[in-house]
Design a protein with these regions (language model features):
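Mature extracellular/secreted ectodomains of secretory-pathway proteins
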Residues: 15, 27-178
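N-terminal cap/lid segment of alpha/beta-hydrolase-fold proteins
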Residues: 169-226
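Short beta-strand element of the alpha/beta-hydrolase
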Residues: 224-235
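Cap/lid segment of the alpha/beta-hydrolase catalytic domain
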Residues: 237-246, 251, 263-291
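Alpha/beta-hydrolase active-site loop
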Residues: 281-317, 344-365
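Short glycine-enriched nucleophile-adjacent loop
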Residues: 301-304, 329-343
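Short beta-strand immediately N-terminal to the catalytic nucleophile in serine-hydrolase-like folds
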Residues: 322-324
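The feature captures the conserved acid-bearing segment of alpha/beta-hydrolase catalytic domains
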Residues: 366-415
């Protein structure tokens, strides 16, 4: 098996070469030879042992928070061959190239999978050992520019957090002292016992079958007037049975709401597990960008059909609220009338564009899969036809997408 013999460090027209054996020796016992000395000496002396340890320590031993799946060679292979994995590797491969200055995408993938399968584990030094070309070429100019941009972004984030903290502390000082022990317990506000009803929805037009759960007050006749309806849309790789979401649904139902929770079968936990088990080629279907808001629409259509027979016509289906997190946040936005700026997305997803912290954002990589859709599907995403006029309220703590929706949100008047 071939391994990388040399590490090429390129910075514009300038370059240096470090023998891989020099890095091996340093990782093994701290030996610093003449070729490696200029680089090791640039690291503060007190940090050099940490650098040595990181080079030779498998990923799973560096942090106790690393899931086992991250270092499983089969699961890694499945993910790295998926559309999102390919996209990630293509971007990294521009920074870490082959000896012949080709994109290192395939070589990096091979090194990761082989290192993960090696008893020595997924460590930087083992990646070098399993890199399948004679040399690894690092584009330092791009790597340093990316690191600088990331550092700037972190500084801006820290500044925003600091400013928000100062404002919060100032408001707390100005506000009267609140004795929380005197406040009522939220659970005491619950007015109704809650029951759960399971549905199986079959949308023949889309050839799509998916389950949904309803949470509602046990005694609907005890509610006066129209019964408000909320729909909760789960996130990417999640499920309608998420305990936290179910708890929120039950809390709403205990206070007079009928809450519906659909299972988005093309982007749920089961679909993601199928990828890891080798039963699927992708972690979610690109058509989910269309199907998710249509799941909401068909669910509302189903509730309208059942309203007169099961709910005495009292469900307030002309003023529905939506709640969504992550991919569910996108679902809420689309069902409320927000559209996608395709031209901007194409620029952000361009693999030949300069690499920035923004275009290696995982959320953007998810969104880039939208460009796989056919023309008619993309048309639905850009013309607002996925909107449902029955939606009157949206709440999305966090949507999964990188795209700036400030322009798109002007397409909807939903608060």
């Amino acid at each position: 098996m071939r391994a990388a013999d040399e590490i090429y460090l390129d910075y514009g027209p300038f370059g240096r070469v470090i023998p891989a054996s020099s890095i091996e020796s340093f990782a093994a016992d701290g030996t610093v030879d003449d070729e490696l000395a200029p680089f090791i000496n640039a690291i503060p002396e007190e940090r050099q042992p940490d650098f040595q340890r990181v080079l030779s320590t498998p990923l799973e031993l560096l942090s106790s928070g690393i899931p086992e799946e991250v270092t499983d060679p089969f699961i890694l292979s499945q993910w790295l061959y998926s559309p999102i994995g390919e996209s990630v590797l293509a971007r990294i491969g521009r920074l870490i190239q082959t000896e012949g200055r080709q994109n290192g995408q395939r070589a990096i993938r091979a090194a990761i999978i082989l290192a993960a399968a090696d008893p020595a584990g997924l460590s930087p030094i083992n990646l070098i050992r399993h890199y399948p070309t004679g040399g690894i070429r690092l584009d330092l100019q791009q790597i340093l520019a990316l690191a600088k941009a990331a550092k700037t972004n972190l500084a801006i984030t820290d500044q925003l957090i600091s400013s928000a903290t100062q404002l919060s502390e100032a408001a707390a000082v100005a506000a009267p002292i609140l004795d929380y022990s005197t406040l009522p317990i939220l659970a005491e506000f619950d007015q109704f016992n809650v029951v759960k009803q399971s549905l199986m929805l079959e949308d023949s037009q889309r050839n799509r079958i998916y389950p949904a759960n309803l949470y509602m007050p046990e005694n609907l006749s005890a509610i006066q007037g129209p019964i408000p309806v909320m729909i909760l849309s789960h996130g990417y790789g999640d499920t309608k049975d998420n305990p936290e979401a179910v708890a929120a649904a039950r809390k709403l139902a205990a206070n007079g709401f009928v809450v519906a929770m659909p299972e988005h079968v093309g982007s749920n936990k089961t679909y993601q597990n199928d990828l890891l088990a080798g039963l699927a080629q992708e972690s979610f279907e690109a058509m989910e960008f269309v199907n998710r808001p249509l799941d909401i629409r068909f669910l509302l259509d189903t509730l309208e059909q059942r309203n007169n027979t099961e709910f005495q016509g009292r469900l307030q289906l002309d003023r529905v609220g939506l709640i969504g997190h992550s991919f569910g946040g996108y679902t809420v936005l689309a069902a409320g009338g927000a559209t996608v700026d395709i031209e901007r997305l194409q620029r952000q997803c361009d693999l030949d564009a300069d690499i920035t912290p923004e275009n290696v954002n995982v959320a953007l990589l998810l969104e880039c899969r939208l460009l796989e859709l056919d023309e008619s599907s993309i048309q639905q995403l850009t013309d607002g036809s996925l909107a449902d006029e029955r939606v009157e309220l949206e709440f999305f703590p966090c949507h999964s997408l990188q795209t700036d929706y400030s322009q798109a949100l002007r397409q909807t008047h939903v608060p």
